[in-house]
Amino acid sequence: MSYKENLNPSSYTSKFTTPSSATAAQRVLRKEPYVSTFTTPSDNLLAQRTQLSRITPSASSSVPGRVAVSTEMPSQNTALAEMPKRKFTIDDFDIGRPLGKGKFGNVYLAREKQNKFIMALKVLFKSQLEKEGVEHQLRREIEIQSHLRHPNILRMYNYFHDRKRIYLMLEFAPRGELYKELQKHGRFDEQRSATFMEELADALHYCHERKVIHRDIKPENLLMGYKGELKIADFGWSVHAPSLRRRTMCGTLDYLPPEMIEGKTHDEKVDLWCAGVLCYEFLVGMPPFDSPSHTETHRRIVNVDLKFPPFLSDGSKDLISKLLRYHPPQRLPLKGVMEHPWVKANSRRVLPPVYQSTQSK
C-alpha cells in the first residue's frame, strides 16, 4: 500500500495537533498500549532497527496552542543528526491528516514530537494481515526497504507495534503518488518521462547491486519527493535473492514479463521489462499491452505485440523496444538506460547518478 497524496510542497505544515487537542485519528491510535514483543507468532518482524534522522524545528509559532513546523525539506545530501536508539510508541507522534487508505490500514502525516521530524506513518492492522496471510510479505518489505539508502527510494526509518497494529515510519513524499499525477495530465512529455526513467534506472541499479529485485514497478508504487523526483515506494513484492533466480508469480498483470506469465524462472531482468512498460505508459497514458481481457493481455505480452502511436519520437521508441524484449538477456541494462541518447537529451535530473559511485567501490 503506497499512500495516495498529491499536494502543494508546503501544505504539510498545517493541522498538527498539540497534546491537548488530539485529532480523532490520534485518539483512536492511542487506545492500545505499546507492548515490547509481538503477540502472534507470525509478527516476529525484523529485529534490527534503523535510526531516525533529525530535522531541526522552525521557530516557535506566536499563536498559542499551535505547533510551528518548518516548510523546508532537507537535501538528500544533508548530514542529518541521528536520534538515539529507542523504542517508539504512538504517543511519540503528533498525527496529522490522512495521506492514504489501503486494504490493511491507513497512512497519516505525522511528526515525531521530540525532534520535530516530519514523516508518513503507515498503520497496519495485524488481524487483516493475518487474515490475508501476508505477514511474510510485510516482514520482507521491512527487512529490505529499511536497509536501502538511495535518493530515489523511499526511506523506511523504523517500525514499532502495539497489540493490534504495526506502525511503519516512512519518509514523507510531499508531491504524492505518481499515478495520480499521470491521471491528471493523461501522459507526460518527453522531458519528464526521461527524467523519471533516469531516476528509476539509477534506483533499480542500486537495488540489483544489492541483490534486491523489485518485481512490481508501476505508477501506483511510485511517489514524488519535494522537488518532484521519483521515489520507489512499495517493496511488498520485492525479494532479496542472492541467486537472483525466482519462480514466484507476482506483480501486476499489465507489467508482467513473458517469463513470469509462462511460469519460468526469472531474475532481476524482470525489472527491465517493467521499466519499458512504465516508459510507454508515461508517454502514451496506458500500458503497451492493455487489452479487454486477461487472456488477450497475456497473449500480447508473450508475443511482444508492441504498437507505437505516431506521436512518439524515434528515440523513445528505441529505448522502449530495447527494454521490451522476449529474451531477458537481450534487454537493455540499466546503465544503458541512463546512457541512452534519448534519456541524456531529455532528462533534467537534479541529482547526479548514484551507480557511478557504487561501481567504483
Curated annotation (Swiss-Prot):
Active site: D216 (proton acceptor)
Reactions catalysed, as given in the entry: L-seryl-[protein] + ATP = O-phospho-L-seryl-[protein] + ADP + H(+); L-threonyl-[protein] + ATP = O-phospho-L-threonyl-[protein] + ADP + H(+)
Keyword Kinase set for record: yes
Cofactor list: Mg(2+)
Regions crossing the membrane: none
Activity control mechanisms: Kinase activity is stimulated by both birc5/survivin-binding and cell-cycle specific phosphorylation.
Xref: InterPro entries: Aur-like, Kinase-like_dom_sf, Prot_kinase_dom, Protein_kinase_ATP_BS, Ser/Thr_kinase_AS
Primary residence: nucleus
Domain (Protein kinase): residue spans on this chain: 93-343
Keyword Glycoprotein among record annotations: no
Post-translational modification: Phosphorylated, stimulates kinase activity.
SUPFAM superfamilies membership: Protein kinase-like (PK-like) (SSF56112)
Keyword set, alphabetical order: ATP-binding, Cell cycle, Cell division, Chromosome, Chromosome partition, Kinase, Magnesium, Metal-binding, Mitosis, Nucleotide-binding, Nucleus, Phosphoprotein, Serine/threonine-protein kinase, Transferase
GO molecular function: ATP binding; histone H3S10 kinase activity; metal ion binding; protein serine kinase activity; protein serine/threonine kinase activity
Subcellular location: Nucleus; Chromosome
A GO biological-process term: cleavage furrow formation
Domain of life: Eukaryota
Role this protein plays: Serine/threonine-protein kinase component of the chromosomal passenger complex (CPC), a complex that acts as a key regulator of mitosis. The CPC complex has essential functions at the centromere in ensuring correct chromosome alignment and segregation and is required for chromatin-induced microtubule stabilization and spindle assembly. Involved in the bipolar attachment of spindle microtubules to kinetochores and is a key regulator for the onset of cytokinesis during mitosis. Required for central/midzone spindle assembly and cleavage furrow formation.
Membership in a protein family: Belongs to the protein kinase superfamily. Ser/Thr protein kinase family. Aurora subfamily.
Protein name: Aurora kinase B-A
Organism name: Xenopus laevis
